[in-house]
Amino acid sequence: MRKIVTEDLIYEILSAVEEIPEGEVATYGQIARLIGRDKNARLVGKVLSRAEDYGDYPCHRVVNHSGRIAPNFPEQKDRLLAEGVAFKNDTCVDLEKHRWEI
């Protein structure tokens, strides 16, 4: 069954992303839990992949559950580094240091 993605849901996700402080990151799952949709981390990712259609949001601050950055978002790493976010390796943020504590 397909999930219906309404404009309200899109803006709810984007509003949650807007709350992530500079220099910190959240996971897709954290954002899903924050909006009361615990099992919808993939839906969050889908919405964020189209976020530029809705305005300027700090989507670069959202990573997967292990801290990995998005493979199709080449400027994500540079933006995070510019905010002082440390990486454990080439593609993974150090979540112990930079995970947003909600």
Where on the chain are the PLM-derived regions?
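Nucleic acid-binding interface residues in structured DNA/RNA-binding domains
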Residues: R2-I102
